[in-house]
């Protein structure tokens, strides 16, 4: 993923009243519980699960009830319970593109503010790789139906 002075990004933060470890676990191992599966998918049918393999280089994908899998990206950094970085391999048409030069990055930091208080800071950067459609993709990801809504659902699931 290319970065530079023209980096186009979405920044979101949410405070959750759970431990740092729980926040990390819900974000990574229980994404199915909070992701908008009906609308935020790339397969033909509503998936039954969102899977993130828990290691650097791991796959991040959706799995349909019939076992069909559609890749979304890769785990770039796996540092529980403090940090997760993902390469998002979806293009401007929300289809998988395996070319790493066209991926964007999702950087999530889980900052412990107490034993049962965690600040989750998410940055989805590199959106300029979408060229002429960069602003369109940014607007979608920056909308209430994008990371804001997803993180609100994450916060509910973490409780």
What are these regions (language model features)?
Residues 23-27, 60, 75, 86, ...:
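Hydrophobic pocket/interface hotspot
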Residues 12-14, 50, 72-77, 103-112:
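Hydrophobic/aromatic beta-strand elements that line small-molecule binding cavities or substrate pockets
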Residues 7-15, 59, 70, 83, ...:
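Intrinsic-disorder/low-complexity, polar/charged segments enriched in Ser/Thr/Lys/Arg/Asp/Glu/Gln
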Residues 64, 88, 122-124:
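Residue-level recognition of conserved beta-strand positions in structured domain cores
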Residues 30-72:
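Short beta-edge strand/loop motif at the mouth of beta-sheet-based domains
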Residues 17-21, 76-84, 109-119, 156-159:
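A short, structured loop/turn motif at beta-sheet edges
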Residues 94-145:
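Beta-strand/loop substructures that line and gate deep hydrophobic ligand-binding cavities in soluble
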Residues 1-46:
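Hydrophobic ligand-binding cavity/cleft-lining segments
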């Amino acid at each position: 993923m290319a970065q530079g002075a023209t980096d186009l990004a979405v920044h979101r933060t949410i405070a959750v009243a759970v431990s740092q470890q729980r926040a990390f676990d819900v974000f990574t191992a229980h994404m199915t519980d909070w992701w908008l599966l009906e609308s935020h998918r790339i397969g033909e049918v509503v998936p039954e699960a969102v899977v993130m393999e828990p290691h650097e280089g791991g796959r991040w994908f959706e799995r349909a009830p019939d076992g069909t899998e559609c890749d979304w990206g890769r785990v770039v950094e796996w540092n529980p319970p403090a940090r997760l970085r993902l390469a998002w391999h979806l293009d401007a048409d929300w289809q998988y593109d395996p070319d790493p030069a066209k991926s964007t990055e999702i950087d999530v930091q889980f900052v412990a503010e107490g034993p049962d208080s965690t600040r989750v800071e998410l940055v989805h950067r590199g959106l300029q790789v979408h060229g002429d459609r960069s602003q369109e993709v940014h607007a979608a990801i920056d909308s209430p139906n994008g990371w804001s809504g997803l993180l609100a659902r994450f916060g509910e699931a973490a409780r």
